[in-house]
């Protein structure tokens, strides 16, 4: 195959330039062949174990399941599926970019990574919307926040993510360059670049805006609630801290990587390249591991900041501690907030009605 008809891309999903040469695009930053195999191996081991424990603890926990747990289990499953492909990329980085595991795994692993990216972002968006409805509109949202609705939403997300990953499955192929195998895509066309740009905007930046908007509204509602109820300081600070940690983890993991991807696609669409391809390549090389690491950090975030999940994991790993008191009630912080805000909203409505009747 002609080398100029293919190109290798560091983001594994989308072609980024219609004129790139595989020899230029494939040039590795020196640290990658040593650091990335070690880093990806650590991500693989901790992520597979963490997500398996998280899924098992929530699935086999006795009693009723929280609505948010359905989204968390699906997110952990998505991360687990992605993590299974990491040994293939460890081998790729260790062999200086050569793909030694065949055409089927070249296509399949790239497709699974693409599905994981879309599925994770959409699930995180739904989780933020669910949290927004539970805290900001606790009374009105009761008819929408049902278990059957959550299962339908998750099934729809998996279906949409599988469809969005099809372009990667169809375009990725094993290519021989100088008798060396590479997992590559055909040269990008302007139509594919436009599709990649639109897909990136609507599957990352729009969900990102939704997530940030939801959590800003939640923070505003919490501030109003605690100011009205007179409960400042510790509870307010803890609630706001958890919110910002969740948002910050998402931003640190995905924003740099997708920003460089966005710039690479835009640069490929323009006749004049304002950013050298070497800078874009370096940016994706450095930020890519952060995006990959997101799949292993979620279980630790939930364990540290969600007492319900922490109890479920400890009881799953150590059944002898089933009756151990963790110093908190069986209800979650969301449950407390939902009940408190429901009372707060009812009180506000009653005050408005009373004020209106007095004015009349």
UniProtKB/Swiss-Prot annotation:
A UniProt-annotated Pfam family: 7tm_1
Cytoplasmic compartment spans: 55-69, 142-149, 214-239, 306-360
UniProt GO molecular function: coreceptor activity; G protein-coupled receptor activity; virus receptor activity
List of residues that carry Phosphoserine: 359
Subcellular localization(s) per the UniProt record: Cell membrane
Domain of life, source organism: Eukaryota
GO BP terms, alphabetized: angiogenesis; G protein-coupled receptor signaling pathway; symbiont entry into host cell; T cell migration
Topology term for the membrane: Multi-pass membrane protein
GO CC, alphabetical: cytoplasm; endosome; plasma membrane
Posttranslational modification: Phosphorylation is necessary for YWHAE binding and efficient surface expression.
Function text: G protein-coupled receptor that plays an important role in immune homeostasis. Acts via its natural ligand GPR15LG, a chemokine-like polypeptide strongly expressed in gastrointestinal tissues. GPR15-GPR15LG signaling axis regulates intestinal homeostasis and inflammation through the migration of immune cells. Controls thereby the specific homing of T-cells, particularly FOXP3+ regulatory T-cells (Tregs), to the large intestine lamina propria. Also required for skin localization of thymus-derived dendritic epidermal T-cells. (Microbial infection) Acts as an alternative coreceptor with CD4 for HIV-1 infection.
Family the UniProt entry places it in: Belongs to the G-protein coupled receptor 1 family.
Protein name: G-protein coupled receptor 15
Natural source organism: Homo sapiens
Encoding gene, per UniProt annotation: GPR15
